[in-house]
Amino acid sequence: DSYYLVKPSYTIANIDRYVNTISNDYGIKNVGFEDIGNTLAGDYNPKARVSREKSMNMQVDKMKSLKESGNLVMTTTGNQYVVPYSDYVTDMDIDSKAVNIIDESVPFYQIAIHGLVNYSGSAINLSEDEKDMILKSADTGAGLYFTFIHQPTSLLQDTDYTQYYACNFINWKDTTI
């Protein structure tokens, strides 16, 4: 899965345009970001250098202004510098399975931020074991998070979106309601 990094100044400049469009055209006051608070990129053009630290500060300033404007903000994975300005953090790491030498884990981070921000782990219907993910969510105080689409998932075959193989709402309706 490849993707391109955009100049930090371009990203920040376009957030206002995006927020204004969804607010004015659709009446939506909430905004969700996948990369703000998750990915830091610098700009190493000698004419307009932006370090990763400056990029982080630009993201924090933008998040502050969105919160002050009354927007609800959702971020993905939520690195610590954006958590104070996020109303909800999705895809937070609530498991330590990435490290093979660990037998048990204590959710220190979740204990520290519990009550400060709402958060969830990865989408339950996209996890390897949905029952285990529900138990881990309860264990860490995380909310339950699902990813749904209305159309049949067969439409996603041979596309860049096959990771959403288990997102058809009709298949999950009885389980989630």
Can you describe what each PLM-predicted range is?
Residues 2-29, 37-177:
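Active-site-proximal substrate-binding groove within the catalytic cores of carbohydrate-active enzymes
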